[in-house]
């Protein structure tokens, strides 16, 4: 390439590149689900059976303030959710024989709709922390203990649960962050320097917090999650210490919400240990049937979702090649902007090659791809692109964010009374 620009490309899929090309190594996954043990409309049995019928491979119940167990064991009963006795009926879990059949793929539901031979993997020891915060500063913990169980949580405090989960030996991700930022009122909140600095600080200090949700359910209050994700990548990657993985979960509270967002994990074998490794290393794709900024306000994905069938990085020539099915368009994104778009006439197979050198003026430190089709959207994790001088893209520190550290800076605004005043009562006095 002579004097042309050379990039060192960090490929999160390098360890599974060959596995991507085999259907057997793709695992349809949801790691954020609820039941009547917390605040959902459907029982655990109803949720499990629907996930099973919809050919999911891996499922975690991350209930509000309740640590998940194997599905044939009764989860803890938290007094906050006793209203379910009057509201949505009895709680219900499966028995040991049913659990075994679900895991080995021999379980029969009323619909009997499952097409896969393998079973549905249970992911225990998951929890959604800060179970009663009105502003929804929620954190999901995995492979953790009961340190966050039954804890209401402090408004605006992400750090306490992240720290507890890390101390337990677990990992975490931040849930629907721009819902907390009230993006439904101000979509540009994801670009406010103080907001970016707030989350960047958490990711710097807690490596066990492996990422954030970028796709969640119907993509209504959290539609700016991808904007925030790109802003964080621009800040953190040039520092040379970490990236942020983008997760997709349905956050289902009803069976009708189950197939709205999920992930395609690429695993060498079907095991919890491999799942954790994949969560830490970013060897998965995030998928959704709703993505308002990318697909349109009224778009609803129908049918087969886009899938990646091959992904190769050629560092010598500075290219990344992605092959997909069930899609019409592949877009490459850098710094939150689309820098290349490749299309075919109708949904089907597509191959897209990006030359980093050709787009060097628009690439700071990463690129990521998204595949669009009638079924929805698929997003890859970011590929770090280092031209040898990443440090020049490291920005000056933004205004110091207000971060709760052990409660020293806990103010009235961080109480439930303060939230009610600031978000519900105070605005009514404004003209």
Question: Where would I find each of the regions flagged by the language model?
Answer:
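C-terminal functional module detector
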Residues: 2-26, 38, 44-48, 236-245, ...
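A metal-dependent hydrolase metal-coordination microenvironment
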Residues: 7-185, 217-229, 249-252, 374-383
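Short loop/turn motifs at secondary-structure junctions
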Residues: 55, 207-208, 365, 379
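Short, Lys/Arg-enriched charge-dense amphipathic segments
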Residues: 66-69, 84-89, 147-151, 180, ...
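Short, solvent-exposed coil/turn segments at beta-strand boundaries
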Residues: 118, 141-146, 207-208, 283, ...
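Long, contiguous interaction/targeting segments characteristic
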Residues: 150-155, 159-168, 174-290
């Amino acid at each position: 390439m002579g004097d042309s620009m050379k990039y060192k490309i960090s490929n999160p899929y390098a360890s599974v590149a060959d596995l991507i090309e085999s259907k057997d190594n793709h695992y349809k996954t949801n790691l954020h689900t609820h039941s009547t043990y917390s605040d959902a409309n459907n029982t655990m049995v109803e949720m499990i059976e629907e996930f099973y019928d919809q050919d999911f491979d891996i499922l975690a119940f991350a209930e509000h303030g309740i640590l998940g167990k194997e599905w044939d064991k009764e989860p803890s009963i938290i007094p906050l959710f006793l209203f379910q006795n009057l509201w949505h009926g009895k709680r219900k879990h499966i028995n040991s024989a049913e659990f075994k059949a679900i895991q080995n793929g021999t379980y029969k539901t009323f619909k009997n709709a499952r097409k896969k031979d393998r079973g549905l993997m249970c992911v225990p020891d998951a929890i959604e922390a800060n179970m009663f915060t009105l502003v929804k500063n929620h954190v999901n913990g995995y492979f953790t203990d009961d340190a966050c169980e039954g804890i209401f949580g402090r408004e605006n405090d992400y750090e306490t649960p992240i720290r507890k989960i890390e101390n337990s030996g677990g990992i975490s991700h931040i849930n629907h962050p721009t819902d907390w930022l009230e993006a439904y009122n101000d979509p540009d909140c994801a670009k406010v320097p103080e907001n970016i600095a707030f989350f960047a600080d958490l990711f710097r200090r807690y490596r066990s917090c492996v990422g954030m949700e970028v796709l969640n359910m119907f993509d209504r209050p959290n539609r700016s999650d991808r904007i925030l994700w790109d802003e964080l990548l621009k800040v953190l990657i040039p520092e040379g210490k970490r990236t942020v993985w983008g997760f997709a979960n349905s956050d289902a509270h009803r069976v009708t919400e189950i197939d709205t967002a999920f992930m395609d994990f690429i695993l060498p074998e079907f095991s919890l240990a491999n799942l954790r490794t994949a969560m830490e290393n970013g060897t998965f794709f995030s998928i959704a049937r709703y993505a308002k900024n990318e697909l349109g306000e009224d778009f609803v994905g129908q049918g087969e979702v886009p899938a990646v069938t091959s992904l190769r990085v050629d560092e010598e020539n500075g290219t990344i090649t992605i092959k997909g099915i069930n899609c019409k368009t592949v877009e490459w994104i850098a710094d939150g902007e689309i820098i290349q778009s490749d299309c075919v006439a109708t949904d089907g197979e597509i191959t897209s090659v990006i030359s980093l050198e050709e787009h060097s003026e628009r690439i700071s430190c990463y690129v990521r791809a998204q595949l669009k089709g009638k079924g929805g959207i698929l997003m890859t994790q970011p590929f770090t692109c280092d031209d040898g001088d990443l440090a020049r893209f490291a920005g000056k520190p933004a205004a110091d964010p207000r971060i709760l550290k052990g409660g020293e800076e806990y103010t009235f605004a961080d109480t439930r009374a303060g939230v009610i005043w600031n978000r519900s009562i105070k605005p009514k006095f404004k003209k």
